[in-house]
Amino acid sequence: MIDRYKHQQLRIGLVSPQQITAWANKILPNGEMVGEVTKPYTFHYKSNKPEKDGLFCERIFGPIKSGICACGNYRVIGDEKEDPKFCEQCGVESVDSRIRRYQMGYIKLACPVTHVWYLKRLPSYIANLSDRPLKELEGLVYCDFSFARPIAKKPTFLRLRGSFEYEIQSRKYSIPLFFTTQCFNLFRNREISTGAGAIREQLADPDLRIITDRSLVEWKELGEERSAENEWEDKKIVRRKDFLVRRMELAKHLLRTNVEPERMVLCLLPVLPPELRPIIQIDGGKPMSSDINELYRRVIYRNNTLIDPLTTSRSTPGESVMCQEKLVQEAVDTLLDNGIRGQPMRDGHNKVYKSFSDVIEGKEGRFRETLLGKRVDYSGRSVIVVGPSLSLHRCGLPREIAIELFQTFVIRGLIRQHVASNIGIAKSKIREKEPIVWEILQKVMEGHPVLLNRAPTLHRLGIQAFQPILVEGRAICLHPLVRKGFNADFDGDQMAVHVPLSLEAQAEARLLMFSHMNLLSPAIGDPISVPTQDMLIGLYVLTIGNRRGICTNRYNPCNYRNYQNEIVDDNNYKYTKEKEPYFCSSYDALGAYRQKRIDLYSPLWLRWRLDQCVIASINREVPIEVQYESLGIYHEIHEHYRIVKSVKKEIVCIYIRTTVGHISFYREIEEAIQGFCRTY
């Protein structure tokens, strides 16, 4: 069992058969060793007790009830440091029943079986180490063909194949004619290698260092070869070099972790603890079993069927034994990863069995849901929305979430203030949502921070502390400047809220995790709470202007409504309600805006100094319209500016068409540039 105080990490890898037996084996006082599961049964149908040496055996996995053995006798549970106590009649150890959550068993396989993860998963580790095609290895594992064993300095029957006049195809029919059935089994075991045993021999034979050195030499030789004219040959060389790189990396990894490659072939199959594959009774007394149990039973049935001809019968045909070995291999494959070889196995209701891989992988698997993504108490989850009026270190919690998170604190407050005499009355007042409840909740929240987390938590700013306040609605309100630390957007993102309970957690939240204390990125040190979106939206609003065009409000003397306009005369500007006003300087335009004579987006004409001309191609653009005055002065009107020229065609002045928002933006940029120039 993993002790959370002693173990800091968990590593998944290949284990040796000796380690598997050490997990499961126990020695009884009479010298008998238990741990091997040999029967495919679970519970007896009459007594409803676990079958001996079955998948739920109490001798192997421990008692169902603490201190009560299979005989029904109760014994005092001793200390873990003391020698274990066993029942002399049934052999069940007197320990706590929680041992059934971590005590394992094993199945001794009658033939070696390859681990399907290392054979069928891409890239195939077995294919990489053996340097053989995956299809060839699959045919070997599932007994579709075999090959001769390399027996050096020994006379073998297969070396005499040149003495026969038969063709290669007829040899498989001619060889059995020279042997009896018993002798052919000896011949097959001595000279023919097939099944997972052949894979095990290939993985155990070469040294990993030799594999690395040979792969490196071949990789260098391929790199020195000149490029062929055939494109297909060049691609073939590139694929071979990539394969050699993967092979060297795999061999080096196995050397670093001290893992023997032959462990990819199983001789012992571990059996999970019973509490991890339970059998429960639903309404009506009908039992419900985990799919793992049915897959284990299938393995044991086929394994026992193979054991009988290997141990008792000497006249079993070789093809029958090979076929049964194939069935054992397929049963173990289904247990480890159902459906990896094609069509998955289904039950009587056409439902796919959930294999060991299905239990641990995916979002609902053992790791992501149970170990990593456990739902904890005193936590909630909701959509986040913008709270621009909030302080940087505050967040808005909906009343519905806040009353659930701080319910225990509110109950304590109600009892202390003698509003409720017990917990039941306090809960009823909370359900009725009396005003005193919200008052106490406000006081509780003032001294208690909360933690907000957005998945995935990729760095430490994915969890930050905030001071909560009550808000209406059902969404969590968040200041927009803390968005970047969470990598969140206000487009439907959800965040989890947690309540730190211990004093250490509250102190850490206040001193280290408050959002106003995490203004810099922990990776590069740049400011992370910067108003990027706010600045863009502000600039857009400031410079949106009036996009209806110059021709919309142009003065038309033929229009009768122009004579009804109210004219406002001033020394600095001329302004009418319908016509676009003229200003001599930006200060005059801003003054008119402050006096609410013009709008932020109202188009206006601003006089521009000739020495500050920034308009490109001012003399090449064709004007939209030309207006003449009585003294010979004329105006060339363009889309965004107008030029006033004298009789001699000299430029008198220039007016640009803009808005108050554009003027404010320009002045801010101008001041920033001047400040930068003074600094440097």
Curated annotation (Swiss-Prot):
GO function term, MF aspect, one: magnesium ion binding
Positions that bind Mg(2+): D489, D491, D493
Sites where the protein binds Zn(2+): C69, C71, C87, C90
Short name of one Pfam family: RNA_pol_Rpb1_2
Gene3D superfamilies hit by this protein: 1.10.40.90, 2.40.40.20, RNA polymerase II, clamp domain, RNA polymerase Rpb1, domain 3
Catalytic reaction list: RNA(n) + a ribonucleoside 5'-triphosphate = RNA(n+1) + diphosphate
Cofactors that this protein relies on: Mg(2+); Zn(2+)
EC number: 2.7.7.6
SMART domains (alphabetical): RPOLA_N (SM00663)
Source superkingdom: Eukaryota
Subcellular location: Plastid, Chloroplast
Keyword annotations from UniProtKB, A to Z: Chloroplast, DNA-directed RNA polymerase, Magnesium, Metal-binding, Nucleotidyltransferase, Plastid, Transcription, Transferase, Zinc
The protein's assembly and partners: In plastids the minimal PEP RNA polymerase catalytic core is composed of four subunits: alpha, beta, beta', and beta''. When a (nuclear-encoded) sigma factor is associated with the core the holoenzyme is formed, which can initiate transcription.
PANTHER family for the chain: DNA-DIRECTED RNA POLYMERASE (PTHR19376), DNA-DIRECTED RNA POLYMERASE SUBUNIT BETA (PTHR19376:SF54)
Function: DNA-dependent RNA polymerase catalyzes the transcription of DNA into RNA using the four ribonucleoside triphosphates as substrates.
Protein's name according to its UniProt entry: DNA-directed RNA polymerase subunit beta'
The organism of origin for this protein: Amborella trichopoda
Gene: rpoC1
